[in-house]
């Protein structure tokens, strides 16, 4: 499948800034997500923009997706709310008519919920540019609230790579293989073996 992917806002047109900088962190998630989807066999079209205004970056993103005849267009964001009280994950779709997109949205929301994020469910809008100006099924993923203490603490624990894994799994319907952690410190290995043998209290 050919997926048009945009990692949120342009470096020249910042998004929300709270405890986390949406633009900076979402770009980390994007950079981790691309190779995961490629490894799963998908072609990724970079729909990011360097525009210095919102209309410019939105238009450039959907234009790239349309010009490349993508099968799906996905943009990644972080949310924000007054006073930092909002929390959780939500996925926006044009409407509820596409079963595939509904399923992907539900899987993504469930993956985030399993890690402690609030599940805000599927949302629908016919007025959001990414959803109405794209000629293919599209989705806006609001991963979390960048100004909420709970959400940002989870993010610091999970990391951009972990967030990307949850999105990739939601899109593909398959678990993303975890990288094995290699213990390189010999002392740690020796102590572990001794403890298993009962030689160390």
Language-model-derived ranges and their functions:
Residues 4-6, 10-15, 68, 72-78, ...:
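Active-site-adjacent mobile loop/cap segments within catalytic or ligand-binding domains
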Residues 31-42, 66-70, 109-117, 168, ...:
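Sec-exported extracytoplasmic/periplasmic mature domains
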